[in-house]
Swiss-Prot record:
Family: Belongs to the 'GDSL' lipolytic enzyme family.
Active site per database record: S32, D334, H337
Keyword Hydrolase: yes
Protein name: GDSL esterase/lipase At5g41890
One GO MF term: hydrolase activity, acting on ester bonds
BP term (GO), one: lipid catabolic process
Alphabetized UniProt keyword annotations: Hydrolase, Lipid degradation, Lipid metabolism
EC number: 3.1.1.-
Gene3D superfamilies in the record: SGNH hydrolase
Amino acid sequence: MCTQDETIFVLHDQQSNNSAAQSFTNFIFGDSLVDVGNNNYIFTLSKADSSPYGIDFAPSNGQPTGRFTNGRTISDIVGEALGAKSPPPPYLEPNTEANTIRNGINYASGAAGILDDTGLLFIGRVPLREQVSNFEKSREYMVRVIGENGTKEMLKNAMFTITIGSNDILNYIQPSIPFFSQDKLPTDVLQDSMVLHLTTHLKRLHQLGGRKFVVVGVGPLGCIPFARALNLIPAGKCSEQVNQVVRGYNMKLIHSLKTLNNELRSEDYNTTFVYANSYDLFLKLVLNYQLFGLKNADKPCCGGYFPPFACFKGPNQNSSQAACEDRSKFVFWDAYHPTEAANLIVAKALLDGDQTVATPFNIRYLNDL
């Protein structure tokens, strides 16, 4: 016997092929750059469930949703451009499985990393390994509703977006904290470990049916207000030491994705891993922000420039007073995350840019395959 939700999905699956072909399904994995509210449902110090977060997010009328920015994430913007009727809901939201086949699901979690121990100081978070396990549970639900063959066909056409790795590197560059710290690994060992674990999770997602993957490289973390303050970097400059760690990881990731494409496409030509070059995109934006119509790439729009970097609404403030006056002109929303304005610029480039932006081709081309 079908439940009410299952009946809805059976009916949905019987709709015309034209409607199905035009739909956009996205399964999103990652950290706070793409978290849309999973951390609202766990005990964690990494939350964005209070004002002024979400102040410019129209679907919630400016109320916080758990997004770590003032408006839309890059995944939100890409989804809209490719025809999504609404963003994939957070996996941990009650009854969220009812959206699995229609829109996909968002498994991302603020403070999460590729490595399980990343984000330990924030207490609660959902590491990538656990996010993939949660997708496996979602897949079991799909099979119950539309069968194994229907699930395989749906997943073959769905997008799998992975945006993670920043927290692993941010944890690495932070000063050691007594009782929580261990001897730091050599940089190349950290990078190799990140790539190895991420590759393992990507292969697992492929085994579960994923065929269209967008793997986002780590951005220039040496340019975010947090890292610049930590390293006493003056305005207009970035920490080259931090960015060097990021570049080394990204280069190894690119090599791994090329290997995956060669290996897995020989088994199934539908398989494609796209590398999204967020590093060069965001670095160009930070260093040339005025060319993009922005006015500030140094200070966060909300919260302090020095510890504790908190972005919150004071007791006698409204949401607008807690943030900068013109949010559409800032690159950074808080000390760690970009504004919707910056996300728009990066998302548009990833959608339609050339091979310097996304390789072997851009996201729109991948979606149309």
